[in-house]
Structure formats: structure tokens, C-alpha cells
Amino acid sequence: MSLQAPKGTKDLLPTESYKWQYLENKFRNIAADFGCREIRTPVFEYTELFQRGVGETTDVVQKEMYTFEDKAGRSITLKPEGTSPAVRAFVEGRLFNETQPTKMYYFTPVMRYENVQKGRLRQHHQFGIEIFGAKEASVDAEVISIPVRIYKELGVEGVELNINSIGCPKCRKTYNEALKKYLSKNYDKLCSTCKTRFDKNPLRILDCKVDTCKEIVKDAPIILDYICGECKEHFESLKNYLDVLNINYKIDPFIVRGLDYYSKTVFEFITDDITICAGGRYDYLIEEIGGPSMPAVGFGMGMERLLLTLQEKAIEIPEEAYVDLYLGNMGDKAKLEVLKLAKELRDRHIKCEIDHMGKSVKAQMKYANRIGAKYSMVLGEEELNTGKATIKKMEDGQQIEVDIKDIDTLIKVFK
């Protein structure tokens, strides 16, 4: 029996990797335009980080984390989300002592034990932006504008931005009391998980995926009616900034997000009923993890879900030829010259491929065509004697005679 990848994981094969490289390069360039620099954090962290950051009553912590003890008996968890590790690194690195704001981005694998389905894997990859140190609603709008630009540049249409405010701990306390009063009428119909959330964190019930609970919360009190004056002013400012940036949005009063660290602004980008990007403000997480009281905002974008969206919308990612020149050979002497020539060209950043299989010239040209080489050139006894060879443009068959010893002129063909 042949071994297979674990359930809920997917190999990224060379035939698909160009799509990821294209997106990653685009995202890096866009992040740089906003002044963000890259951060990389470990693939596993101490479990306490996610218990304190994400929240013990969340589905992520209760049901979805890959947690184990290491040989020293320490509880370790594979990273289920990207924000808490970024905050931990920010605090541990004492970046809060630097001039603020601190802007960072990351690409990271994320592991959650979820039901495997379309667009949902147990290991997926996330692109994230985190901005620390700025409390104004203008930075929320700036963060939201990054996915907007990404979708515009990729040509993704039909993406809906939904926003909400879940207030601060002070006004959320008032809302939780109203929510519990409403939910108490249907307490017996709540799922077992939501019954445990009822006293500890009733807001989490709004995020439950069980049908009976979803039906119950349809007529629940709306949190926007309970937020304090400061949170209301922040939300109004956000809407004004989005209007100035010509970013369309809808207010969805039931967006709460599945992670406990959020406060004030929360948002989701949705297409075809699938959330492809989400985020919000988390003004209390840095302090919770051991740093100073400092505001922050960010988002996470699932790479696999984005690629699925591009596929469903028939948006093709351009594939650049990964071979500039296929160097064919006829005979052992020619192969030696091909090896030397390939080295010189590769040293000048010309992507070359040569034959290592002893194929016939016909088979070599067939292979060159299959791998999408831009040009091909074959060296044999005649080419070695004359020092001249013919480069063939694979796309249209155009031929150019070149001096195989004149590397500078040869390189100009590919530029």
C-alpha cells in the first residue's frame, strides 16, 4: 500500500507552484506599498498562547487545535491562526519600544482539525497583515483597503465586504446581559457547546454553526444598539473613511468572528457564500499576551480559498516560462560543450535545461516543447567545428544564427 498525505492536507506540486509564487509576489509588493515588512513565526507555539489569545470558549480552542505534549511535558499546539503568534513575537521582541505604528505581513501554514470540505483543509495557508500601535479608524480602513486592492488587481468581481462593530469590553458586558436574557427563552434548544458558552461567553453563540442555534440567534438583540459612545464614534468614522476610499460595504450586525480577541471593528469579505478574507481590531490582545496596552488591527486571507475562487471565476494566473533555453546535444563531445555553455548562461541568470537522458534530438525537442522552453538550440559536430549555432524560437519557429562563444550577444536574445 502506497503512503498518502494525511487527510485534510494537500501537496503543492511543481505544476501548481507558479500560481502561489505569483500571488505571493503580488501580495508582497502590495504589502510593501503600505509600509509592511515580513515577519516569520514558528509553526508551533505554547498552547497557553492560543488559550489566552484566541479564547478558551472558541471552537478553535475547544475542538480544532492540534495539541500535544513535548518530551519535557510542555503543552504545544500547531499554529491554528496567525495573529496571536505575530503578537507574541511583537511583545517578545519588544517592538513596542520602537516608533509606532509597526506594520507587518506574513505567509504561514495554519493547522485546524476541521471537517474536510470544499475550500476547507486541515492545513491551509494564510496571508496576513497586522498593524500595531494605531487606534484611529483610518487604519482600519487602510487595512480593509488592502484586500480590496488585491481583488481588484486579480480581477475578482462579486466580492462583498461586510462590516460590524462588537464594541469594547465595557459595552459588550451590557450587550451580553441582553443577549443572555434573550437566549434564556430557548436555552434548552441550544447545542451542548453553546450551553457551556451561555455563562462564560454568550457572544460566541452568535458564531455557532449548528442549525438550531443559527435559527435561535436570527432574532437576537443587535450589538450595534448597545455599543458605547466611543465605539459608536469609531464605527461612524470607519464608515466615513470607507466612503472616502470609495469602498462599498454592508453592515452585518451578526458578524462577531470566531476568535475572542476582536474588539470594535470586525469585517469579512464574502463571495458565493464563502468567506475568503476576514479580520478586525484587537485592542486588548497585546496586553493580554504580556505587552503594554496597545491597539492593533489586521486580517487573514486563506490562500487555498482564494485560489478556489479564482478557479471558479475562470481567472487564470499567468504562467511564466521556467526555461529560457533548451540546449540539445548530439554526442558526448557536444554534451561537454553544452554543459559548459549552460553553466555560463546560468551564471548570467538565463534559465537553461539540458538532456541528461541520452535522448534523440527529436525526443529532446519534444521535451523542450513540453516544458515550455522559450528557445531551443542543438549543438553537434558541425556547430562545434564552425562555432555557429541556430537558436529557434519555439513559439513561432523563428531562427537566429549566433556565435556560441559570444555569450554577451547570446544573452541579448533572451532579454
Curated annotation (Swiss-Prot):
Which Gene3D superfamilies does this one have? Anticodon-binding domain (3.40.50.800), Bira Bifunctional Protein, Domain 2 (3.30.930.10)
Supply the name of the protein: Histidine--tRNA ligase
Q: Which gene encodes it?
A: hisS
Mention any one GO cellular component term assigned to this protein in its UniProt record.
cytoplasm
An MF annotation (GO) of this entry: transferase activity
In its UniProt entry, the species of origin is given as: Clostridium botulinum (strain 657 / Type Ba4)
The superkingdom listed in its UniProt entry is: Bacteria
Q: How does it assemble?
A: Homodimer.
Primary location class: cytoplasm
Q: Where can this protein be found?
A: Cytoplasm
Question: Per the similarity annotation, which family is this?
Answer: Belongs to the class-II aminoacyl-tRNA synthetase family.
